[in-house]
Amino acid sequence: MKTECLPFSQIPHTSRLFSDYLSYTPTVREFYPRSPLFPEWVKDEAQRVRYDDARRQTVSDTLENQNRNFGAGPKTFANIERLRRGAQTAVTGQQVGLFGGPLFSIFKALTAVKLAEQATAAGVDCVPIFWLATEDHDLAEVNHVSLVSADGVPERLAIESHGVEDAPVGTIQLGPEIDPVVERAVALLGDTGVARWLRGTD
């Protein structure tokens, strides 16, 4: 597939301010002190944001312990070691949700990964961090997921939330009540890697 890139200045109805900002003209610099160009911007931010070694070591130790308990892979521990040695971070997060929550949670995590890769390529060692907001108390907000059926109709799958309304959602352990929800999700997803993962057979 052939792609062609056009500068915004050649796209009709693009505002002059927007074009000037992307070109980072001297006039614009008066109002926007940081360049919109990622390599320059990330280098400026890396110089501006500094953490003391004690805090960095505490965060690194905590991440190492948590990820060991999660069964994380070697790349995660290599990134934690990079953080310990001074790497910057691209941080994002989301409240926990049934089966990982909405798709944009995954997009947020992937964005942190891509930003960290781009920063590293620009000369600023950077690792991605995605945190789960487990302290949220609104189970009714995260106890469900919508999947699309074979005929294209969204179907809402939910777990019961009675009896645990006041608990942080990260402390709630699901029992057999999740089984029918998992089975329905598997039926909607068909024979896919995600379905096998939900069943625990992948």
Which positions does each model-derived feature cover?
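N-terminal targeting/trafficking signals and adjacent low-complexity tails
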Residues: 1-202
